[in-house]
Curated annotation (Swiss-Prot):
InterPro entries: CTLH_C (IPR006595), LisH (IPR006594), TPL_SMU1_LisH-like (IPR054532), WD40/YVTN_repeat-like_dom_sf (IPR015943), WD40_repeat_dom_sf (IPR036322), WD40_rpt (IPR001680), WD_repeat-ST_regulator (IPR051350). The modification Phosphoserine is found at S101, S103. Residues 1-18 have a biased composition (Gly residues). It is found in: Cytoplasm; Nucleus; Mitochondrion. Forms homooligomers. Identified in the CTLH complex that contains GID4, RANBP9 and/or RANBP10, MKLN1, MAEA, RMND5A (or alternatively its paralog RMND5B), GID8, ARMC8, WDR26 and YPEL5. Within this complex, MAEA, RMND5A (or alternatively its paralog RMND5B), GID8, WDR26, and RANBP9 and/or RANBP10 form the catalytic core, while GID4, MKLN1, ARMC8 and YPEL5 have ancillary roles. Interacts with DDB1-CUL4A/B E3 ligase complexes. Forms a complex composed of at least WDR26, a G-beta:gamma unit, and PLCB2. Interacts with AXIN1. Residues 27-39 have a biased composition (Polar residues). It comes from Mus musculus. PROSITE patterns: CTLH, LISH, WD_REPEATS_2, WD_REPEATS_REGION. This is WD repeat-containing protein 26. Gene3D superfamilies: YVTN repeat-like/Quinoprotein amine dehydrogenase. The keyword Cell cycle does not apply.
Length: 641
């Protein structure tokens, strides 16, 4: 096949002259050669490789075609042969030139597309000419230019030239990701619809209402495609000015921006051998970076799709030294076992509850990440085993152990007790969760109490006979998840008083927590350890190994950027950290001397974590000393030894 109509073939005749343009397009798409070109030794690749240099036999009938369809012909072949004879080195070079592999051609085209996007057009022309490849099919080039110029009639004619390429069997295979229901005829109709829609909107913006109406009635409507969209487009006729049109249509307006977006949409319908998908090299590089991040066990920085934020010259590997594996501070103000710790939602404070009957609120220094005592809340006679921050961090609710029938609601800013709630001396209120509106909370315990209350402690609703171990309010504002003594997690709807089973374990659920998106649940299961459940599919996703979990209540947590990590205390005095996708721990933190009851990851500072222990201390964990936090990405180049 002589790509793009380049001259060649036996006796200096045009290669493939017997082919119709449609058949030539099909051959270009399918990687087929015309009979005459084959006999002359010229083979073309499916993505448009131009004919190779003259063969070792020195056949003058071969022709070297110029990029993008500029004819070479017999004269060019003769000139090349003469140059080869005059310059032995050049002739030898041409003779030794090998046909590029498919992957090499693909890479060259990707590079060419990227360079084109940078405006290095002359470099692209030279690259295509020297490699013998072409960036895209000539018809696709015309189509691109006409779309960007807004020449809609010519662009529509170009679609007819592209039709054989869209209809070819190879195109069907390449576009396997498209829905099977999309017929080949439908693809052309969709592309035409997108073109005419842009044409219609540009007429409207220019104030050419009659021309726009003509496009709507005589061109768009007869396509009988997406009638709902046509009704929407007809409504734009009522727009009084261009700004109103752009706002209602969510459209950038006539010009390069909107036409580039249109072209991106149109390219998805064409096989890549005809026209490359938009910004294909950037897409591949971004995918490679994302895969490396996914495989990086210690990656704990914000995901950024901008390739400028990473180096493409080295593999991405984060150092363990930037991970919260090192003790930064030991808080010793509690004088007895510390049962619970929890960072505020804004990450500026930490609340710790202890058997010593106090709650201590700590302030996090935004610069040094060190904590200092802010307030001590006293009077919890039975100790504090659970704490919950209100959504806006203005209030703090504290619960006690099994024997405690009271619940304390504190004003964080003033340190004053707003409400001390107790429904009955027989109650056991050991868990609490805030409704997302911040005006209600639910509380309960193992003696069968399950209440919904307002900020003044007034009882709004109750659910009888539910022995609650742990609670969590979902973001829908209606559903409350509760683990109970039947080794399950159930969902309770306080609006219609319905309930349903969500998770069923074989052993007691000591505590659980929910991911920010409400999809995953992390359970601490007696004698089993830490389990990850998918609440939507209601399946057990993973069992994490290493932790020692008996019948003590241990609270684990999600943490890090994107909640990619899981941390839990353990009865063997350690803190265990796992990557969410790995069952084996990536870190075991030592330092506590008794059971670690609770771990909390700072939601705003992903390199900070707190752990509370029966040894009476709270440990603050962070990166290794002397890490420059402003240049943490520089630490991602090598794994710490």
């Amino acid at each position: 096949m002589q790509a793009n109509g380049a001259g060649g073939g036996g006796g200096g005749g045009g290669g493939g002259q017997g082919q119709t343009p449609e058949l030539a397009c099909l051959s270009a798409q399918n990687g087929e050669s015309s009979p005459s070109a084959t006999s002359a030794g010229d083979l073309a690749h499916a993505n448009g490789l131009l004919p190779a240099a003259p063969s070792a036999a020195g056949n003058n009938s071969n022709s070297l075609s110029v990029n993008n369809g500029v004819p070479g012909g017999a004269a060019a072949a003769s000139a090349t042969a003469a140059a080869a004879q005059a310059t032995p080195e050049l002739g030898s070079s041409l003779k030794k030139k090998k046909r590029l592999s498919q992957s090499d051609e693909d890479v060259i085209r990707l590079i060419g597309q990227h360079l084109n996007g940078l405006g290095l057009n002359q470099t692209v022309d030279l690259l295509m000419q020297e490699s013998g490849c072409r960036l895209e099919h000539p018809s696709a080039t015309k189509f691109r230019n006409h779309v960007m110029e807004g020449d809609w009639d010519k662009a529509e004619n170009d679609l007819n030239e592209l039709k054989p390429l869209v209809h070819s069997p190879h195109a069907i295979v390449v576009r396997g990701a498209l829905e099977i229901s999309q017929t080949l005829l439908g693809i052309i109709v969709r592309m035409k619809f997108l073109l005419l829609q842009q044409k219609y909107l540009e007429y409207l913006e220019d104030g050419k209402v009659l021309e726009a109406l003509q496009v709507l009635r005589c061109e768009l409507t007869p396509l009988k495609y997406n009638t709902e969209r046509i009704h929407v487009l007809s409504g734009y006729l009522m727009c009084s000015h261009a700004e109103d049109l752009r706002a209602k249509a969510e459209w950038e307006g006539k010009g390069t921006a909107s036409r580039s977006k249109l072209l991106d949409k149109l390219q998805t319908y064409l096989p890549p051998s005809v026209m490359l998908p938009p910004r294909r090299l950037q897409t591949l590089l971004r995918q490679a970076v994302e895969l490396q991040r996914d495989r990086c066990l210690y990656h704990n920085t914000k995901l950024d799709n901008n390739l400028d934020s990473v180096s493409l010259l080295i593999d991405h590997v984060c150092s363990r030294r930037q991970f919260p594996c090192y003790t930064q501070q030991i808080l010793t103000e509690h004088c007895n076992e510390v049962w619970f710790c929890k960072f505020s939602n804004d990450g500026t404070k930490l609340a710790t509850g202890s058997k010593d009957t106090t709650v201590i609120i700590w302030q996090v220094d935004p610069d040094t990440h060190l904590l200092k005592l802010l307030k001590t809340l006293e009077g919890h006679a039975y100790g504090v085993s659970y704490i919950a921050w209100s959504p806006d961090d203005s209030y703090l609710v504290a619960c006690g152990p099994d024997d405690c029938s009271e619940l304390w609601l504190w004003n964080v800013q003033t340190g004053e007790l707003r409400t001390k709630m107790s429904q009955s001396h027989e109650d056991s209120l050991t868990s609490v969760a805030w409704n997302p509106d911040g005006k209600r909370f639910v509380t309960g315990g193992q003696r069968g109490q399950f209440y919904q209350c307002d900020l003044d402690g007034n009882l709004l609703d109750s659910w009888e006979g539910v022995r609650v171990q742990c609670l969590w309010c979902l973001s829908d504002g209606k559903t409350v998840l509760a683990s109970d003594t039947h080794q399950r997690v159930r969902g309770y709807n306080f609006e219609d008083l319905t309930d349903r089973n969500i998770v069923q374990e074989d052993h007691p659920i000591m505590s659980f927590t929910i991911s920010k998106n409400g999809r995953l649940a992390l359970l601490n299961v007696a004698t089993q350890g830490v389990h990850l459940w998918d609440l939507q599919d209601r399946v057990l996703v993973r069992k994490y190994q290493g932790v020692t979990q008996g019948f003590y209540t241990i609270h684990s947590c999600f943490g890090g950027h994107n909640e990619d990590f899981i941390a839990s205390g353990s009865e063997d005095h350690k803190v265990y950290i796992w990557h969410k996708r790995s069952e084996l721990p990536i870190a075991e933190l030592t330092g506590h001397t008794r059971t670690v009851n609770c771990v909390s990851w700072n939601p705003q500072i992903p390199s900070m974590m707190a752990s509370a222990s029966d040894d009476g201390t709270v440990r603050i964990w962070g990166p290794a000393p002397f890490i420059d936090h402003q240049n943490i990405e520089e630490e991602c180049s090598s794994m710490d030894s």
